[in-house]
Amino acid sequence: MTEKENLGGSTLLPAYFGEFGGQFVAESLLPALDQLEKAFVDATNSPEFREELGGYLRDYLGRPTPLTECSNLPLSGEGKGFARIFLKREDLVHGGAHKTNQVIGQVLLAKRMGKTRIIAETGAGQHGTATALACALMGLECVVYMGAKDVARQQPNVYRMQLHGAKVIPVESGSGTLKDAVNEALRDWTATFHESHYLLGTAAGPHPFPTIVREFHKVISEEAKAQMLERTGKLPDVVVACVGGGSNAIGMFADFIDDEGVELVGAEPAGEGLDSGKHGATITNGQIGILHGTRSYLMRNSDGQVEESYSISAGLDYPGVGPQHAHLHATGRATYVGITDAEALQAFQYLARYEGIIPALESSHAFAYALKRAKTAEEEGQNLTILVSLSGRGDKDVDHVRRTLEENPELILKDNR
């Protein structure tokens, strides 16, 4: 693997976020990355492209998504009323999650480049589903690589992809999860990039993918900022999003980064505990290295090999993280915290029980952190407004949660009303 020489001077857009990012890929892929970057720059400068994309976001995806204030949480107690939790409802985007925002943008880019085939990787199946429906809409061939373990635990999404006409290829190598699906997708793209576009599903990978994904997801924070100002007359105190690779979080953070008074928090999967060896908290507990074409934080062992990540949530089960998140952490602009499986399961049940919303397990990590902060604010009598990215709906997780709670009855929510 080689990095493109003189990278800072030979790309149209900045390829690094501080020391993180770059293009650590086989030289044979550099022309494809150059073509993608040029197409992206041309498209974003085109009023016609922006109008077409805006039309899809409005009429097909259902944007803008609403902002919902939790009416029953945090639970009643002394000091009730100090903390307010608002949910940015990306679970209501067509396809069931935030993923469709940037997928529509990238598929339009692919058509603009004359590509006829789309390659994607998926973990929980949400990105694969979004890619499959976008390809069905726009008449492109779709191939989705998915870890064999994820295929087994996300059967409803596998069938949804197939209904949209996608070919789903289970990946047996390695741990059979998202990391291995990315590897296979990159191999495919290396061999077929003249007719194929690799539609990366997270804000990681080689430049220009982190920038492209952020810009197509930025609509989340642009809408949320305007909605918070309209509803509360001020910006939120805290913005929280779950972080695996980091796409929904960078979309949720993007328009708040320059607002120094807004605290940005990424909720990483602490799995069975940060000291258990079974987690995916890349920034909280990882090291700097190179994975999937970018320099960022990753999970690796004492020999320098990439470690297998773990999370109850397939969409957070990734041993790397987007380079802009690494930079936000390194500069202190954002804070990244670990949320355990047990905490996420409690939050999943709380939101379903008390607000009538079934969140994705991924989003439940962010909501779990919001509940913690709200509890502290209530106890201390501190006025606090928390904005949570509810990145996806939990239909895909219901069976998994049911089985897990049957096996671990101590995690079943006790009714506190």
Curated annotation (Swiss-Prot):
GO terms for cellular component: cytoplasm. The modification N6-(pyridoxal phosphate)lysine is found at K99. InterPro entries: Trp_synth_b_CS, Trp_synth_beta, Trp_synth_beta/beta-like, TrpB-like_PALP, TrpB-like_PALP_sf. It catalyses: (1S,2R)-1-C-(indol-3-yl)glycerol 3-phosphate + L-serine = D-glyceraldehyde 3-phosphate + L-tryptophan + H2O. Keywords: Amino-acid biosynthesis, Aromatic amino acid biosynthesis, Lyase, Pyridoxal phosphate, Tryptophan biosynthesis. Its EC number is 4.2.1.20. SUPFAM superfamilies: Tryptophan synthase beta subunit-like PLP-dependent enzymes (SSF53686). It comes from the Bacteria. The keyword Lyase applies. Pathway: Amino-acid biosynthesis; L-tryptophan biosynthesis; L-tryptophan from chorismate: step 5/5. One of its GO terms (molecular function) is tryptophan synthase activity. The keyword DNA-binding does not apply. Its cofactor is pyridoxal 5'-phosphate. The beta subunit is responsible for the synthesis of L-tryptophan from indole and L-serine. Tetramer of two alpha and two beta chains. Belongs to the TrpB family. This is Tryptophan synthase beta chain.
